[in-house]
Amino acid sequence: CNFLLNLSATSDLNVYNASLTVQAARPIFNTTYLSPIINFKDDNVTFKYVEFQQLEFNENRVTGSDPLVSNLTATIAYYANMILGFDYESFSLRGGDPYFQKAQNIVNNAPDGRNISGWKAFDGIRNRYWLVENMLNSRYAIMHDVYYNYYRLGMDKLYEDENTARAEILNVLNLLNNFNTDNPNKMINQFFFQGKSTELIKIFAKAPPQDKIRASELLQKLDITNAAKYKDELK
């Protein structure tokens, strides 16, 4: 996995405003290929840091003694648990729940302050609060099937039975379409597709015409950011 912290502003008080890009990939069975499982940019990371300062995280004392100092360690610990959660989820149905629950504990006990955001429901519709909420909300339980089916029943089977695996991945797109219809504009739907456009195009480029058309229609609807790319490359 990769964590890229990009500083955008600072002050004389050793306080930094930054964005954090989190990337993680999962090995695919019988190949050397790594499939992206997380590719997310968090634009709301404000923290205090003094050169050579030791960074420590205690899950029983998330806020620490200084909220701005602990905001960095809490954010990193949160995403570390989300990475583990999605990784375990892709190998075992609901296997990621223990890590999502740890991430939610961090959210519930997160540092609080005037310059700190991303931990609360009212901080926006796509932030740390909503990501883990979407994965633990029983109303959205189908997302556990989505992750498991996409990776374990789809991607992991591509080498041994490409047609069956592709059909499973198309079924995942249908599940996501149903989810999006019932729960429009949820963070987890957009989150799932980030970093996957090239992979999905390669999967469906060799599909039978009817499956390719259906996949293109669904992808253009579900992954609007890359809609033109799907339309052009999945003809």
PLM regions with names:
Residues 13, 52-57, 71, 143, ...:
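Surface-exposed peri-terminal alpha-helical interaction modules
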Residues 1-39:
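Start-of-domain marker
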Residues 91-157, 215-234:
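Glycine-rich, aromatic-bearing surface loops/beta-hairpins
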Residues 148-235:
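A cross-kingdom marker for long, charged
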Residues 13-16, 31-33, 89-94, 205, ...:
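Short, solvent-exposed secondary-structure capping/transition elements
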Residues 49-111:
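Internal, conserved structured core segments that host functional sites
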Residues 27, 45-47:
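A sequence/structural signal for flexible, mid-protein segments enriched
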